[in-house]
A protein has these predicted regions:
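Intrinsically disordered, low-complexity and often Lys/Arg-enriched segments
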Residues: 1-33, 265-290
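Conserved pre-catalytic core of RNA-dependent polymerases
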Residues: 7, 15-240
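Conserved polymerase palm-domain catalytic core
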Residues: 104, 145-149, 154, 161-347, ...
Length: 356
């Protein structure tokens, strides 16, 4: 893991411990792991310590000095007393009779190496602070339910971990057929109604919080030419909560792919526990040998945000898997897979690029 990423993780943990929030987040994680639903999260989100922790975490990010449509940045918050910061966040979220209304998001086009641009949405700094407050509380709840095969924008996970898992698939497991998937404009096309149901399925049943997340997704977008758009889909890149929401959307894909092979019911039937040194592990090898004699498709997923690969043992499985996954994404997530950019690669004959 790069030292920079490791330092950020350590800093986040140190900040959470300083404000006394780490035990709270740990408890949320374990309660979520036990299948508990959460109906009253707003008091925790708007607690003084969570707000001050959010400020500290945002300040550590260089992007906090980039102004939104109100021309303010983190320095405008830093000059205020802590109690004033906490009171203002609470007022922004709950003070209006119309509920929380985020200010317009500033749209900025970032050049890409291929000559195209990537749209970036920059919320106003106070709205970023609200998003960070929400993220800190719901992230441990979601982490308890996220797939082990997802590596992007998650605590203590990195690009290096995803690449290492990829090498394991190719070199140790001999899964040489790689399906390179491309979802057209993923962040701009996330279905809001579907996302709300997925958040609910995570165990987040606080209706006031879900209403606020809807408002964040519907925040007006101020375009470079000065016009304003009201989005009916998508979660803008640049929003603090957007990567977490993206993982919530695609976690359903992770779990479905795993259910087709890694966590298929036959694995539980034929797998068994065995002791290796001082630990107990669940051995799937016997189950997999039996499953390969059936018509099941052997497939494994490695995902980093919206960039993912599926690994298969032979071309026939790869062709069937490509068709099945494409149909599933279209029907269940209401997203479009690019037929031009999605392809099957035999890595023994051709190169497959993943995460650079």
């Amino acid at each position: 893991m790069p030292k920079k990423n490791k330092t950020l993780c350590v800093d986040d943990l140190r900040h959470a411990e300083y404000y006394g929030m780490q035990p709270v987040f740990d408890e949320l994680y374990h309660r979520s792991l036990e299948g508990e639903n959460f109906t009253d999260l707003m008091d925790l989100i708007l607690s003084r310590d969570n707000i001050l922790l959010a400020y500290r975490n945002i300040k550590a990010n260089g992007g906090s000095y980039t102004a939104g449509t109100d021309n303010k940045n983190i320095s405008d918050i830093g000059c205020l007393p802590p109690e004033t910061v906490a009171e203002k966040v609470r007022f922004i979220v709950t003070g209006s009779q119309h509920g929380y209304r985020p200010k317009p998001v500033r749209r900025k086009d970032i050049p890409k190496p291929n000559g195209k641009t990537r749209p970036l949405g920059i919320p106003c700094i106070w709205d970023r602070l609200v998003q960070q407050c929400i993220k800190q509380v719901i992230e441990p709840i979601c982490e308890a339910k996220f797939s082990d095969n997802s590596y992007g924008f998650r605590p203590n996970r990195s690009v290096e971990h995803a690449v290492q898992k990829t090498y394991t698939m190719l070199q140790r497991m001999n899964l040489h057929y790689v399906i390179e998937f491309d979802i057209k404009g993923f962040f701009d096309n996330v279905n809001h109604s579907k996302l709300m149901r997925q958040i609910w399925a995570m165990g987040i049943h606080d209706k006031q919080l879900i209403f606020i997340i809807k408002r964040i997704l519907k925040a007006p977008i101020r375009m470079p030419d000065g016009t304003t758009l009201i989005p009916d889909k998508g979660t803008p890149q640049g929003g603090i909560i957007s990567p977490l929401l993206a993982n919530i959307v695609l976690n359903e894909l992770d779990k479905w792919v795993e259910s087709q092979w890694q966590n298929h019911p036959l694995v539980k039937e034929y797998g068994y526990e065995r002791k290796i040194r001082n630990s107990i592990t669940f051995d799937r090898s016997k189950a997999f040998l039996k499953m390969r004699k059936t018509g099941l498709k052997e497939m494994y997923i490695v995902r980093y945000a919206d960039d993912f690969r599926i690994f298969c043992r032979n071309k026939e499985d790869a062709l069937r898997t490509k068709e099945a996954v494409t149909a599933w994404i279209t029907e269940r997530l209401r997203l479009e897979v690019s037929p031009e950019k999605t392809r099957i690669v035999n890595v023994r004959k051709r190169y497959s690029e993943f995460l650079g």
